[in-house]
Regions:
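Long, charged amphipathic helices and adjacent flexible linkers at domain junctions
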Residues: 200-201, 308, 444-468
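N-terminal entrance/gating region of PLP-dependent enzymes' catalytic architecture
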Residues: 13, 38-121, 321, 461-546
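PLP-dependent aspartate aminotransferase-fold enzymes
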Residues: 84-99, 104-209, 511-547
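Charged, compositionally biased N-terminal leader segments and the immediate start
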Residues: 1-13, 17-21
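Active-site C-terminal subdomain of aminotransferase-like
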Residues: 269-370, 374, 379-381
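Glycine- and acidic
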Residues: 105-109, 131-137, 165-170, 210-214, ...
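Conserved C-terminal alpha-helix-loop-beta "cap" of PLP-dependent enzymes
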Residues: 351-454, 485, 491-493, 503-505
Length: 547
């Protein structure tokens, strides 16, 4: 037996145990078992072409060599994906801990209290940041969440709208393009007409059941949507807002200016970009939609001894109960990512989140001031972290110099581009950006130091957040690594995971991902790659996808 092969380490039964099991059920071999259980018309006649098996050691050498092909440049593309700083205590104790990553969907509350509390933290985070009364425990990503919200609005139309066959969903042309594509795909099969355009010129007719806007929009501009919301409400149309979660530490939350549903991604809360995933989409809405909303909802109850306990609430929406009539499928919840995002908020607390958001905004302010001195025109009157610019020279000139300095911007057209700042950006990074932009227009730039970072918000008063958030005890207790580590362990031991026992439920998710397979996930050659990076920077990802 090859002791280091994946097969011998990853598949539990030994050869003699396999033979004993086969004898018990009356078949001579695994091939015979497959032939008897798989219909002949769908059974492959030849083995899959998957190449020669590797040992775990050989695989790690192979994947390391492959990873080196990717180019991990400093990326300021934005578009819903931003570099973050994952706290080491979360990486070590959740992401790389089988006590968290092997646990099964918490149908059985009595062996899931740890994860249920972690997911409740996530729900609380989302409800607090958006100021919506109800949030679920995550979806796949922002685009999926937006499409689910559209469908929820469609199913929740008033009787009058249903009678009139209202089927139009208005979508601002300023939402992220990947979100729009998913919305169009999901709308097609439901005969929903997606109308894309300038939200300020939308006509709310009796056929319009809902509308969607982005906050801040895909170009980075922070807009006042109050008049738009008034028009929609007058027509009894429902409002969907796709919001940047980190920006809501500084901006007035959508729940305070009329949103019926708020969606987005929690990726900014400590999750790596990872070429676009996995992330955890969030979904928050008014209580009117609680029986129509998708995703798991964690609720507080009491156990048989009268003590506080947690369970999944409103499960009658789910596929395991309603089957084909279900309004929710919780399989695509990205629960581990939601847990990590929630714990990012627990670890930093309100003060930490506010500090991170403010620092991002202040660095963007510096960039905004300096680029205009170099002759670039900046379009966004108000912004959080993204600037959209018109260049005095063609963007291919800027791109050439930027690539020489291993920097990626978002190039929109031949003379327009955008830059998004994130949690990992430093004043040194701002200097590097400005030196690229100065060189492109044949000017010089004198480097700035940390004293240039200001404290003033360049956001109008009516768009600044006034309400408090994350005041709950859980977000104001575990701010040292020791406290956080103990809290995570306390939750972990309340659960039953594959590192302790077999889980008494069967599912497609019951397969253990080997440590060797998961090990490269956090390598920067994979974790820091933007999904819209140039293709010549991601050959390793493209090879993996092709294979």
């Amino acid at each position: 037996m090859e002791i280091n092969s994946f097969l011998s380490r990853h598949v539990g039964p030994r050869p003699e145990e396999v033979q004993k099991m086969l004898k018990t059920i009356g078949v001579s071999s695994l091939d015979s078992l497959i032939e008897q259980t798989i219909p002949s018309e769908i059974l492959l006649k030849k083995p899959l072409s998957v190449g020669k098996a590797m040992s775990e050691y050989d695989y790690l050498n192979h994947i390391r060599e492959l990873a080196r092909k990717n180019k991990s440049y400093k990326t300021y593309i934005g578009m819903g994906y931003y570099n973050t700083i994952m706290p080491s205590v979360i990486q070590r104790n959740i992401l790389e801990n089988p006590g968290w990553y092997t646990a099964y969907t918490p149908y059985q509350a009595e062996i899931s209290q740890g994860r249920l509390e972690a997911l409740l933290n996530f729900q609380t985070l989302i409800a607090e940041m958006t100021k919506m009364p109800l949030a679920n425990a995550s979806l796949l990503d922002e685009a999926t969440a937006a499409a689910e919200a559209m469908i929820m609005f469609f199913n929740g139309r008033s009787r009058e709208m249903q009678k009139n066959s209202a089927n139009q969903f208005l979508v601002s042309e300023d939402i992220f393009p990947q979100t729009l594509e998913v919305i169009k795909t999901r709308a097609e099969v439901l005969n929903i007409e997606v109308v894309v355009g300038n939200h300020e010129k939308f006509e709310f007719t009796p056929m319009v059941f809902g509308a969607m806007i982005q906050y801040p929009n895909q170009w980075g501009e922070v807009k006042d949507y109050s008049q738009f919301v008034e028009k929609a409400k007058a027509n009894r149309s429902m409002i969907l807002v796709a919001a940047d979660l980190m920006s809501l530490a500084l901006l007035t939350p959508p729940g305070e200016w009329g949103a019926d549903c708020v969606v987005g991604s929690s990726q900014r809360f400590g999750l790596p970009i990872g070429f676009g995933g996995p992330t955890a989409g969030f979904f928050a809405c008014k209580e009117d939609f609680k029986r129509l909303m998708p995703g798991r909802i964690i609720g507080v109850t009491i156990d048989a001894q009268g003590k506080r306990a947690l369970r999944m609430a409103l499960q009658t929406r789910e596929q395991h109960i309603k089957r084909e009539k279900a309004t929710s499928n919780i399989c695509t919840a990205s629960a581990l990512m939601a847990i990590m995002s929630g714990m990012y908020a627990v670890y930093h607390g309100q003060k930490g989140i506010a500090t991170i958001a403010n620092r991002i905004h202040q660095l963007t302010n510096i960039l905004n001031e300096e680029i205009q001195k170099l002759g670039y025109k900046q379009f966004n009157k108000y912004f959080f972290d993204t600037l959209c610019m018109q260049s005095p020279v063609k963007t291919d000139v800027i791109q050439k110099i930027a690539l020489e300095n291993e920097i990626n911007f978002r190039y929109i057209c031949e003379d327009c581009f955008a830059i998004s700042i994130d949690e990992t950006t430093s004043i040194e990074d701002i200097n590097a950006i400005l030196n690229v932009l100065a060189k492109a227009v044949n000017k010089t730039f004198k480097n700035l130091d940390k004293s240039a970072i200001g404290t003033t918000l360049t956001i109008p008063q009516n768009l600044q957040r006034k309400s408090s958030y994350l005041s709950q005890a859980v977000f104001n207790t575990y701010h040292s690594e020791t406290e956080m580590m103990r809290y995570l362990k306390k939750l972990e031991i309340k659960d039953l995971s594959l590192n302790r026992a077999m889980i008494p439920l069967g599912s497609c998710t019951m397969k253990l991902n080997a440590a060797t397979e998961l090990y490269p996930v956090s390598w920067p050659e994979f974790s820091t790659i933007h999904p819209f990076a140039p293709q010549d920077q991601v050959p390793a990802y493209l090879q993996i996808i092709h294979e």
